[in-house]
Regions:
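Flexible, solvent-exposed loop/hinge segments and secondary-structure transition points
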Residues: 20, 85-96, 100-105, 113, ...
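Conserved, well-ordered alpha-helix/loop/beta-strand core segments that scaffold catalytic motifs
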Residues: 52-96
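Beta-lactam-recognizing serine transpeptidase/beta-lactamase-like catalytic domain environment
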Residues: 47-57, 103-142, 148-378
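Structural motif corresponding to the C-terminal cap of alpha-helices
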Residues: 83-91, 116, 323, 404
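Short, gly/Ser/Thr-rich active-site loops of penicillin-recognizing serine hydrolases
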Residues: 296-299, 391-409
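Small/polar-residue-rich segments within soluble enzyme cores
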Residues: 1-65, 269, 393-398
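A short acidic/glycine-rich loop-to-helix N-cap element
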Residues: 381-392
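Amphipathic, well-packed alpha-helical segments that form the structural scaffold of globular domains
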Residues: 31, 35-38, 81, 85, ...
Length: 409
């Protein structure tokens, strides 16, 4: 194999062994069509190993492997990798992931997780570098998951953006206290303000009062936030969520704001895609877009995950409010309306216990009313203080907007 781009997209492409067999990445996933078939020559021999004229003979020529065309834009991929690596360093995290996804088609334009892999140099492969962790690893999403809670409530007709909720300083559940990330006095908020200010208390109470936890659980399943996406990449993670019948009150509250549930960055990106494209349809994320050698058509599944599409416009407007007036101000892309959600989740160690003053940070968003419906996720893990990944998102979307000549409608 020759890798002209070095480490760029190295995790996506993956590794082969000395015999050319795929070991990781797309080399493994598409091994059967990439490696081709060896030829065979069998001759009947006589004395001294000489072929017998007219004897049994098998002559099967070798078959070349097929070419495949991927959705990855290598220049955009390089930019995303460089910006993500810098962002992880600036924020002080242990590792990070980024996804740039076309919500209209399911094409993965760029995807990366630090540390990176250079398939052409195996002398120093870092731990965790051989797979795209945005696909293969679960994490607790934190407040970016609140969008799913609000989508479910809007779909059910339980709330509007102006529905109010009384928010005490904290609420109690099973001897625990739930409060917001930032100190505030008891107040009354609209649903739009709850999302913009990322209130854990407000989100919990709105779901409890206007949807119910069983209703939320059903929608989580419908949105595909507990299942693998079906992406063409080996080792995709599935989500983790226990059945609602086992939920305690504290777990019920926690799920509404993205704790006590695990999923992959690609799973949440797919969900946001169904909002960004305005149709409620989620397209299977994928890399393969063409098989030119065979001419075989490549198709991918789509699913109507948001059934009441009347919920999409008000939800999008509320996500715009997050960037205009709330926790996501630093994500605003100049010249465009920007919608999205910040997330800060407490970091859980290998035992499942939360580590004090250690966080996973993320942002996922899109550009409403633009000529291209790209969704971008950026997450940084194991950060020793509360910050955000908004600026990395902003820079990636700014680069994409310029590169693809995206215009505001």
């Amino acid at each position: 194999r020759v890798y002209p781009y070095g480490s760029t997209a190295g995790q996506i492409l993956g590794l082969v062994d000395v015999d050319g067999n795929g070991q990781t990445g797309l080399e493994l996933y598409y091994d059967d069509i990439l490696k081709g078939e060896a030829g065979k020559l069998v001759l009947q021999q006589g004395a001294y190993g000489m072929p017998i004229p007219g004897g049994t003979e098998v002559d099967e020529p070798a078959k070349d492997g097929q070419d495949i065309i991927l959705s990855i834009d290598i220049d955009m991929q390089q930019y995303v990798e460089e910006r993500l690596k810098q962002g992880v360093s600036d924020i002080g995290g242990e590792d990070g992931s980024a996804v740039l996804y076309d919500a209209d088609t399911g094409d993965i334009i760029a995807i990366a997780s630090t540390p990176y892999l250079d398939p052409s140099d195996r002398s120093n492969i870092e731990e965790g570098a051989t797979s795209v962790k945005a696909i293969t690893t679960q994490f607790e999403p934190g407040s970016i998951f609140k969008t799913a809670s609000f989508c479910a409530m809007l779909e059910a007709g339980g709330i509007t953006a102006q529905t109010t909720v009384d928010c005490p300083v904290y609420i109690e559940a099973d001897e625990y206290k739930i409060s917001d990330a930032h100190e505030r006095a008891a107040t009354t908020m609209t649903a739009a303000e709850v999302l913009a200010q990322s209130s854990n208390v407000g989100t919990s109470l709105l779901v409890q009062q206007h949807l119910g936890f069983s209703g939320l659980y059903d929608k989580i399943r419908k949105y595909g936030l507990n299942d693998a996406t079906g992406v063409d990449y080996p080792g995709e993670a599935e989500g983790y969520l226990t059945n609602v019948s086992t939920w305690s009150l504290i777990q019920s509250y926690n799920v509404t704001f993205g704790q006590g549930i695990s999923l992959s960055p690609l799973m949440i990106t797919r969900f946001y895609g169904a909002i960004a494209n305005g149709t409620g349809v989620a397209h299977t994320p994928h890399f393969l877009i063409a098989k030119p050698s065979s001419g075989e058509e490549v198709t991918w599944d789509s699913e109507q995950i948001i059934e009441n599409t009347d919920a999409i416009a008000p939800l999008t407007e509320m996500l715009e409010g997050v960037v205009e007036n709330g926790t996501g101000k630093m994500a605003a892309v100049e010249g465009y309306t920007t919608a999205g959600k910040t997330g800060t989740a407490e970091y859980a160690d290998d035992s499942g216990s939360y580590v004090k003053n250690m966080y996973n940070l993320d942002f996922v968003g899109f550009l409403p009313n633009a000529t291209s419906n790209l969704v971008c996720f950026v997450g940084v893990n194991h950060v020793p203080y509360e910050r955000n990944t908004c600026e990395v998102f902003k820079d990636i979307m700014t680069e994409a907007s310029s590169r693809y000549k995206i215009a505001q409608k």
